[in-house]
Amino acid sequence: MCGGSFMSESQSELDKYGTNLTKTAATNKLDPVIGRDAEIRRVCQILSRRTKNNPVLIGSAGVGKTAIVEGLAQRIVAGDVPESLRNKEIVSLDLSALLAGASYRGEFEKRVKNLLEEIQKSKVIIFIDEVHTLMSAGAAEGAIAAGNMLKPLLARGELRLIGATTLDEYREHLEKDPALERRFQQVFVGEPNLEDCIAIMRGLKERYEAHHKVSISDTALVTAVELSSRYITGRQLPDKAIDLLDEAASSLRMEIDSSPVELDQLRREVDRLRLEELALKSENDPTSEQRLRSITNQLSGKQEMLNTLQASWNSERARLNQIGALKEQIDIAKQSADIAQREGRLEDASRLLYATIPQLQKNLAEKLEEQDSAPLVSDQVMPEDIASVVEGWTGIPVKKLMQKDAKQLLHLEEDLSKSVIAQKVAIGVIADAVRRSRAGLSDPNRPSGTFLFLGPTGVGKTQLVKALASLLYDGEIVRIDMSEYSEKFSISRLIGAPPGYIGHESAGQLTESVRRRPYSVVLFDEAEKAHPEVFDILLQVLDEGRLTDSHGRTVDFRNTIIVLTSNIGSRYLSDISLEATTAHEYVNDEVRRTFRPEFLNRLDEIVIFEPLSQSDICQIVDLNIESLNKRIKDRRIVVTVSEDLRRWLSKSGYDVIYGARPLRRLIQREIEDRLAKLIIEGLIHDGQTASFDLSGGAVNAQVCS
């Protein structure tokens, strides 16, 4: 009587504070576990020991530690375990449920003590996820932590416990208590390679198809693994690949459940025409009557198209729902067949395997054949869907090149030349690097391009970087002004202050910017003004495309273009007595004296910008006037400049040493200041034109309607 009563109470206590994984596995509610044979075998070996039979799974978050325990539960159900583990049960203990409501001193300890006694009697294997929480669970003032209560049982082998934790948590909590640590046997769980991860994804495919009621192509599985491995940093396989697949399937299911874009647009058009028809019916003039007849005819045609499209969509959606229901039925039938085989109900298993499932598969094949040649919505997850999710997560455009994107890349030099004048060599180098990256030919372990731009001030070095960011990177530019890093101690601002220093909690300016925007242009402006040791930090970035910040996080630079600008040797380029080849040699010599060889050797290209000529300045005048017109576009005011004034501006604003910046100041003083006075005095109004001309050596403004 006592034994029967105790087991009943024990079962209720275990149910209260835990989840029976073997029972869940017996009903096929756990996802299939593919691979991890070595880790599961090692766990079985440790559990079969006489003492210290407590494995602890240690690995990064997302590598599949919990899945290994679920795989062991499935093997116990299937009988594929050593004799010592046959008919055992694995119970996942919920420490939060054990702690909840234990408000009085000693209540938590009593719960733990009763639970441990019941576990010893029932001979179950306990699994605790985040096992490091044992160290602090219940450790209030005057109380005993759960970890200390477990130590004697763990040492004697009277309690079998499987733990799971991360490397950092293990080091921080368990290693600090050697008495508890030595009672566990470590099982390291590493990240699976790409081939193993693809096998895992294929094993999960049917479950996700049944849940989302869509089909998943094999290429989508492979794409999910490859893209997550390359573009999603800070997380581990297979977790991040599974998340990609899950979200892509969820997005597709949402599209199926809502109206297609074509149908939605047509419905809105019909609603607009109906409103216009109602408004015109109250008018009696001939024009309105004629317009009403036209609207009525349009509405009739659009309504007929809408009805046809709606009927087609209803039919297609019904077919998709039937396909989803059939897949779900097949999945349930397969699970039922597995359960029947394990329980020895061979007649039921035979009926399911050789009658029910083949019939369902036949019905599914028939429904799939009914698919329209041009469906409104696809029910299959394709690589493009996976790429869309990656783009949404990271901002990196990993979709296959669209026609317009390819056209833009082919004409990138022309587009950049509209913003940067007379620097064809530099523009060509940058454009080639971008095309290599977008075509997938660049080294996947290095940044898309690393350049050092040299030349006099005001020739367009920074402007070229801004133009590239505006065209291809949606304006995403990470700008680091190196003049702010002239002191040695300021280096820590790039990656964050080290532990123990003020500002350690704050992120580094460089690492945090790239971590948040991994697809961007990184500009190190005025590089020669920084402390020499700053460039030691950049060596790893230029060579391996990664950098570790002060918090130990690895930041990925592989999708960035890195540009450093400098004025080193600009005096040689501005010296008109030197030939271009000689000037370039002098500049390169000075660069080699300023920067270390290991730094220069990691750059893709050192680009020298040429000084601007008088004709180049004329084109820059046009660019500045165009920029001014864009700024006042909202007022509908237009600024025009006569040819005489244009030539005068280019001549007066030209300086071979200072480049185009004196011209900008001249235009600001002679044109923008005069225009500002006209606007404030009310002499020019919206929609008018301000014409600027040169008369008697002075600039005059005239307002035209």
From Swiss-Prot:
SUPFAM superfamilies: P-loop containing nucleoside triphosphate hydrolases. Residues 612-705 are annotated as: C-terminal. GO terms for biological process: cellular response to heat. Signal peptide: none annotated. The keyword Acetylation does not apply. Residues 1 are annotated as: N-terminal. InterPro entries: AAA+_ATPase, ATPase_AAA_core, Clp_ATPase_C, ClpA/B, ClpA/B_CS1, ClpA/B_CS2, ClpA/ClpB_AAA_lid, ClpA_ClpB. Pfam families: AAA, AAA_2, AAA_lid_9, ClpB_D2-small. Residues 14-191 are annotated as: NBD1. Residues 192-395 are annotated as: Linker. Keywords: ATP-binding, Chaperone, Coiled coil, Cytoplasm, Nucleotide-binding, Repeat, Stress response. Residues 242-373 form a coiled coil. It is found in: Cytoplasm. ATP 2 binds at residues 455-462. Gene3D superfamilies: 1.10.8.60, P-loop containing nucleotide triphosphate hydrolases (3.40.50.300). Part of a stress-induced multi-chaperone system, it is involved in the recovery of the cell from heat-induced damage, in cooperation with DnaK, DnaJ and GrpE. Acts before DnaK, in the processing of protein aggregates. Protein binding stimulates the ATPase activity; ATP hydrolysis unfolds the denatured protein aggregates, which probably helps expose new hydrophobic binding sites on the surface of ClpB-bound aggregates, contributing to the solubilization and refolding of denatured protein aggregates by DnaK. Homohexamer. The oligomerization is ATP-dependent. PANTHER family: ATP-DEPENDENT CLP PROTEASE (PTHR11638), HEAT SHOCK PROTEIN 104 (PTHR11638:SF18). Belongs to the ClpA/ClpB family. This is Chaperone protein ClpB. It comes from Tropheryma whipplei (strain Twist) (Whipple's bacillus).
